[in-house]
Amino acid sequence: MPAIVIIGAQWGDEGKGKATDLLGSRIDYVVKFNGGNNAGHTVVVGDEKYALHLLPSGILTGGVTPVIANGVVVDLDVLFQELDGLIARGVDVSRLKISSNAHVITHYHRTIDKVTERFLGKRQIGTTGRGIGPTYADKINRVGIRIQDLFDENILRQKVEGALDQKNHLLVKVYNRRAIGLDEIVDDLLSYAERLRPMVVDSSLLLHQALEDGKYVLFEGGQATMLDVDHGTYPFVTSSSSTSGGAATGSGIGPNRIDRVIGIVKAYTTRVGSGPFPTELFDEWGEFLRERGFEFGTTTGRPRRTGWYDAPIARYTARVNGVTDFVLTKLDTLTGIERIPVCVAYDVDGVRHDEVPASQSDFHHAKPIYEEFPGWTEDISGARRFEDLPKNAQDYTHALERMSGARISAIGVGPARDEIVVRHDLVGEAPSPADASR
């Protein structure tokens, strides 16, 4: 059976949790393969709203096995806060599995993250300060702490001691902060071990066996393509691989097992933190999108930057990920706008660019070239078929589909889990290349 990857196709906060939830009743496993608790998603179930930061959204669907795979960095305090919060609300969390190879965020990672960002001043990246980047840096530098290390105190103590030799030198000599004690870190990590033990598995083997047994496996990407460490707007990116390729390396399955890649795009664009954003709005329309779309970070609560839909970005992310289907979210946010601008290309120093410039400098100087489309005033939250949408909303969707590099297979028309229009089956046979790129 297929492995399906869901990817954010802009700068994050596109509504991936809702798309995952849409597929949940037909999915057996939901896998988080990158990132940590630096990106949140909100899932609405009936009258209940759940804000998740680390746990896969599949944990809210009965019968689904949620998996935190090896590509994730895990803050154990956040993990158990989220689990305990769900347990208190009657959610069964006993199915959760965590890779023994996932890396652990410690107190010193969070400290380094925060003081480094302050030290950078105007050059700061805009991190969430949750220790994600420093944990991935330790992973690459081969001094990281993995989940499996918590079950051997001698190994854990040796690894933490080696890491603190460097971290404390940096904190004391460069940042003028106090040193962090070895026992403080080791005791904290060991306190989680026994509760964690029943959840820990070889996630690569688990997922391989699931696919061999004909199970449906959904890979849920954190952050988004334009924040990918290789393919995003570097250096204003996250520290992990947030494209479809990261699903294979971040979980231990072969790339040939991936059958479909579903890209999630808002009907407009948002971004959090620093970095280029060609369609960003600084006027009343930017505030309109922010207030109407509730564009405030699930993790940080900070206001998101807002702008119009960017078709070159969608084409770029379709190409980088091999997107077979797009899910267009928050179309309802645009209701009431008389003329809706869409960025169709960029002007860079008087030269038209139909695609995202490869040069970082060019992209920083890119000015959007807009085409406008007529809007609609009707409430679309009750639409369940494409034909139920106002003609102008249908035309807007068709226009985005033509410009974006893959078919739009579902459309979000409201915040609730059932407020969605499904045009094409997202679990059945994948579209042909001609259909996917039309």
Curated annotation (Swiss-Prot):
It comes from the Bacteria. Its main location: cytoplasm. Binds 1 Mg(2+) ion per subunit. Substrate binds at residues 298-304. Pathway: Purine metabolism; AMP biosynthesis via de novo pathway; AMP from IMP: step 1/2. It catalyses: IMP + L-aspartate + GTP = N(6)-(1,2-dicarboxyethyl)-AMP + GDP + phosphate + 2 H(+). GTP binds at residues 12-18, 40-42, 304, 330-332, 412-414. The active site is at 13 (proton acceptor), 41 (proton donor). SUPFAM superfamilies: P-loop containing nucleoside triphosphate hydrolases. PROSITE patterns: ADENYLOSUCCIN_SYN_1 (PS01266), ADENYLOSUCCIN_SYN_2 (PS00513). Keywords: Cytoplasm, GTP-binding, Ligase, Magnesium, Metal-binding, Nucleotide-binding, Purine biosynthesis. GO terms for cellular component: cytoplasm. Its cofactor is Mg(2+). It holds the Pfam family Adenylsucc_synt. It is found in: Cytoplasm. Mg(2+) binds at residues 13, 40. GO terms for biological process: 'de novo' AMP biosynthetic process; IMP metabolic process. GO terms for molecular function: adenylosuccinate synthase activity; GTP binding; magnesium ion binding. Plays an important role in the de novo pathway of purine nucleotide biosynthesis. Catalyzes the first committed step in the biosynthesis of AMP from IMP. Belongs to the adenylosuccinate synthetase family. PANTHER family: ADENYLOSUCCINATE SYNTHETASE (PTHR11846:SF0). Homodimer. This is Adenylosuccinate synthetase. It comes from Leifsonia xyli subsp. xyli (strain CTCB07).
